[in-house]
């Protein structure tokens, strides 16, 4: 997208219309592009066809929100953009990566795996997080322990508190991905 102005699909429509106005005999083939950030799922769905799936997940501050991902190739491939649940616009005025989480991204990944996706593409653009993916891993069943052997979900400000990681609870649905 063109951050806060137009999506790549909208830009394609505008450019196609203007080119056709100036060069009426031209054939315009518009191919939207994305960089992995906001709008990437819509571009994949426009180019490859497919289905948009909407679910409830956690936002960067662990509040409930509705976010979506795309399924293409008859559900075999899932396309997820971090921006849909952990994007910069969701940070609001706070914009503090020490307290944000990627937990919602993990929830999207798990949902896609549960629906049978074998390949999961995650676009990392426009993130307001800095938790090293620990929130995402937590949503997928990984446990993080602090020095008191208490489990917690790390964020950018608590990464240094990780003393032990237990992957034994990793979601079984991910085994075929």
Task: List the model feature ranges, each with a label.
Residues 2-24, 83, 95-119:
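N-terminal glycine-/serine-/threonine-rich phosphate-binding loop
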Residues 2-7, 65-75, 100, 122, ...:
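Phosphate-binding glycine-rich loops and adjacent basic patches that engage nucleotide phosphates
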Residues 99-103, 107-123, 128-176:
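Glycine/threonine-rich beta-strand-loop-alpha-helix active-site module
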């Amino acid at each position: 997208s063109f951050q806060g102005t137009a999506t790549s699909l909208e830009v394609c429509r505008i450019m196609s219309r203007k080119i056709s106005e100036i060069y009426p005999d031209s054939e315009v083939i518009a191919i939207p592009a994305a960089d992995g950030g906001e709008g990437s799922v819509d571009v994949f769905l426009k180019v490859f066809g497919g289905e948009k799936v909407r679910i409830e997940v956690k936002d960067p501050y662990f509040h409930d929100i509705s976010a979506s991902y795309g399924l293409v190739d008859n559900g075999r491939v899932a396309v997820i953009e971090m921006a849909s649940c952990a994007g910069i616009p969701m940070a609001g005025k706070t914009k503090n990566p020490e307290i944000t989480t990627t937990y919602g991204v993990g929830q999207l990944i798990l949902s896609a795996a549960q629906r049978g996706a074998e390949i999961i593409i995650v676009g990392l653009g426009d993130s307001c997080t800095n938790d090293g993916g620990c929130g995402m891993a937590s949503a997928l069943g990984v446990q993080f322990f602090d020095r008191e052997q208490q489990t917690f979900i790390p964020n950018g400000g608590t990464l240094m508190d990780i003393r032990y990681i237990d992957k034994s609870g990793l979601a079984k649905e991910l085994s075929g991905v």
